Amino acid sequence: MKKIVYLALFLGFALTNTSCNSGKKAQVINTFVKTYFPDTEVIANIKDGLDCDVTLSDYTQIGFDGNLFGKLEWDEVDCRHTSLSTTVPAALVPTEISNYVNRIHGSQSITKIAKDNRGWDIELSNGVEIEFDKRFNVIDFDD
């Protein structure tokens, strides 16, 4: 019982004492935005549990996945609703995925990318969605 109380206190402190607007999380977000979207600024920054959801001035949406140790890493970039028909920065797209898109869908650009522990999901400018496993094999294709 004592362990459960301590765990509940720890989790409660960890979840309430972290913010996306200050500290290390804000620094990670600001560095990411300045690096990959230098002509924009953050207009909304919403904390969702340990995660942070950010909207930029061009309406790009970025999801950051957090953990109990304060680490924050991007897990989704969505440029589909931007005011400037922006594509996902090439530096965020693994080479294997870029090569596949260029080879098979040459004239299309990547407008959304998401990653998790199973692999990667992308959406192209023509609306085609492609899912890759960790080894960058195509495992699902939805047009």
Language-model regions, residue ranges each:
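Bacterial Sec-dependent N-terminal signal peptides
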Residues: 1-28, 33
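Short, non-transmembrane alpha-helical segments in secretory-pathway proteins
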Residues: 22-41, 85-109
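A broad structural signal for short, well-ordered beta-strand segments within beta-sheet-rich domains
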Residues: 41-42, 69-72, 106-114, 138
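Hydrophobic transmembrane signal anchors and adjacent membrane-proximal interface regions, especially
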Residues: 2, 16-18, 31, 69-72, ...
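Surface-exposed charge patches in extracellular/virion surface proteins
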Residues: 34, 66-67, 103, 118, ...
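A generic structural signal for short, solvent-exposed coil/turn residues
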Residues: 12, 34-36, 46, 102-105, ...
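Amphipathic N-proximal alpha-helical interface segments
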Residues: 53-82, 126-143
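Exposed beta-strand-loop-beta-strand "reactive/processing" segments of non-cytosolic proteins
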Residues: 41-64, 111-130
